[in-house]
A protein has these predicted regions:
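Short linker/helix segments within small regulatory modules
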Residues: 124-133
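Short cysteine-rich clusters marking metal-coordination/redox-active sites
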Residues: 115, 135-138
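Flanking scaffold residues of small Cys/His-coordinated metal-binding clusters
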Residues: 110-113, 130
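Acidic, turn-prone loop/beta-hairpin segments
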Residues: 1-43, 47-67, 91-94, 98-106, ...
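Basic, alpha-helical nucleic-acid-binding regions used in initiation and control of genome expression
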Residues: 118
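Short metal-binding segments enriched for Cys and/or His
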Residues: 142-148
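Cys/His-rich metal-chelating microdomains
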Residues: 121-124, 138-141
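A glycine-rich helix N-cap at a beta->alpha junction
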Residues: 78-92
Length: 148
């Protein structure tokens, strides 16, 4: 129970307004990452047209960037990049000798085995016979759910 007036349906309720964004640095970081994602999506679509990949999860994205603000940002969020780009793997090459601000993006077909649950391509699947065909991440997620 929540005090106060309510609409007839939750779908008619209004979201509370926010005066200011609390962490402007975080917002700036994610805006830059979304710009990179736009470039990655263009490269993915090009390789899809060339029939190199089918879905984006069937791809490995290789990014080469200079050692600077963008390079540091990509390194900081490295573990989240495959989920952000919806690909199986991201290979990051930060080059201190590269003076160009250009981002080099290369898309290749992913190798390895396809997880039956998340459809990512991984080097090996779990060895647990009760979770056959799953990557370790999915096997762990199912174990957490069962034991919770």
């Amino acid at each position: 129970y929540l005090p106060g007036e309510r609409s007839a349906s939750v779908h008619l309720e209004k979201f509370p307004s926010v005066d200011t964004f609390i962490d402007s640095e975080l917002l700036n970081n994610w805006n830059q990452l979304l710009e990179v994602r736009t470039e990655v999506n263009i490269a993915l679509e090009e390789q899809r047209k060339n029939k190199v990949i089918g879905t984006s999860l069937g791809a490995v994205v290789k990014i080469k960037a200079q050692e600077g603000l963008l390079g540091k940002l990509l390194t900081q969020y490295y573990k989240q990049l495959p989920m952000l780009f919806i690909v199986s793997e991201v290979v990051l090459n930060i080059d201190s000798k590269n003076k160009s601000d250009d981002l080099k993006i290369q898309v290749e077909r992913a190798t390895g085995m396809k997880c039956e649950r998340c459809w990512r391509y991984v080097p090996t699947l779990t060895s647990d016979p009760n979770k056959e065909g799953l990557c370790n991440r999915c096997a762990d997620a199912l174990t957490e759910t069962v034991s919770s």
